Curated annotation (Swiss-Prot):
A biological process term (GO) from this entry: positive regulation of transcription by RNA polymerase II
Assembly: Component of the srb8-11 complex, a regulatory module of the Mediator complex.
Signal peptide segment: none
Family: Belongs to the cyclin family. Cyclin C subfamily.
GO MF terms held by the record: cyclin-dependent protein serine/threonine kinase regulator activity
Record keyword Repressor present: yes
Taxonomic source organism: Aspergillus fumigatus (strain ATCC MYA-4609 / CBS 101355 / FGSC A1100 / Af293) (Neosartorya fumigata)
Gene Ontology annotations for the cellular component aspect, listed alphabetically: mediator complex; nucleus
Pfam families to which the protein is assigned, alphabetical: Cyclin_N
Protein name: RNA polymerase II holoenzyme cyclin-like subunit
Keywords: Activator, Cyclin, Nucleus, Repressor, Transcription, Transcription regulation
Length: 302
């Protein structure tokens, strides 16, 4: 997907303000207070963690690339800016987003194979009728106005690696931070290059002495960011800090000379700190039970 981000539908149609996202969700709440009362759901970020983990399980069964999983997560976010989650079967939406993302990221899977693997994971929520996924795919494409190309931060990370002399460990940790940002609203709020710069800063500043980073960065970053995050944010806001290690100083200098949205980078970092704090409350069992009760009670699995 090498198209120009600046001319993309992602930039023109799928970036929101925090206020706009809050307004959309409030409209959903006001539009169906009964459903919100009857079927309480966890914090959106906890749901995002659950959805991400389910996508990873599905992807592993088909050896799917990370970028396809990331695209699927963005599709899910976009879909739920147009639809109240309590009126949908999230497992069908998740499976359909995965199926569509694989096609768009040029690693397509046969529809029957996807349905079969999804049924093996969530037999009580996915029917063997492949036409259900086909119908949901049509709805997903329609709600996104056929705007299916997604630009990700991974590309910017790869481009900046030589310029910023990033080590393989720093790149791996930054990659994991990018994975984690899909668990927040950040893909709907900021450009991919802003996310990539945030991930690089976090990786360079908080990188442990050694580590093997796969999937999420939460285990190695949560405590460090909570304890030291504000100092780094102050240095970034100041742009002239004196005393940081040479590599961090070089990064701050590069940032000051670039045209990157510093305020956006800081806000993205704060959002990541907040994610890692709420992650401590995550319970896969709770998410599964609450979603399952909702889907079954409303017959959304039919």
């Amino acid at each position: 997907m090498a198209a120009n981000y600046w001319a993309s539908t992602q930039r023109r149609h799928w970036l929101f303000t925090r206020e706009k996202l809050a307004e959309i969700r409030e409209i959903f709440r006001e539009g169906d207070k009964v459903a919100h009362s009857q079927f309480p759901l966890p914090d959106q970020r906890l749901l995002n963690i659950y959805f991400s983990q389910q996508l990873i399980k599905l992807g592993k069964r088909m050896s799917t690339r990370q970028q396809a999983l990331a695209t699927a997560q963005v599709y899910i976010k976009r879909f739920y800016t147009k639809n109240e989650i309590r009126h949908t079967n999230p497992y069908l939406v998740l499976t359909t987003a995965f199926y569509l993302a694989c096609k768009m990221e040029e690693c397509p899977q046969h529809i029957r194979f996807v349905v079969g693997e999804a049924r093996s994971l969530w037999p009580e929520f996915i029917t063997p009728d492949v036409s259900k996924l086909g119908e949901c795919e049509f709805s997903l494409i329609s709600e996104m106005n056929s705007q299916l190309i997604v630009h990700h931060p991974y590309r910017t990370l790869s481009e900046l690696q030589p310029e910023l002399s990033l080590t393989s460990d720093e790149v791996a940790l930054a990659w994991s931070v990018i994975n984690d940002h899909y668990l927040t609203d950040l893909p709907l709020l900021y450009a991919p290059h802003v996310i990539a710069v945030m991930a690089i800063i976090v990786a360079v500043v908080f990188k442990p002495n050694s580590g093997n980073f796969h999937g999420s960065a939460a285990p190695v970053l949560a405590g460090a960011m909570r304890d030291g995050g504000m100092n780094v944010l102050a240095a970034l806001g100041d742009r002239t800090g004196s005393g940081p290690p040479l590599k961090i100083q070089k990064l701050i200098n590069w940032l000051a000379e670039s045209e990157v949205d510093i305020k956006g980078v800081i806000e993205c970092t704060q959002e990541l700190v907040s994610l890692y704090e709420v992650w401590e409350q995550y319970s896969e069992k709770t998410c599964k039970e609450l979603l399952g009760r909702m889907v079954k009670a409303k017959n959304l699995d039919k």
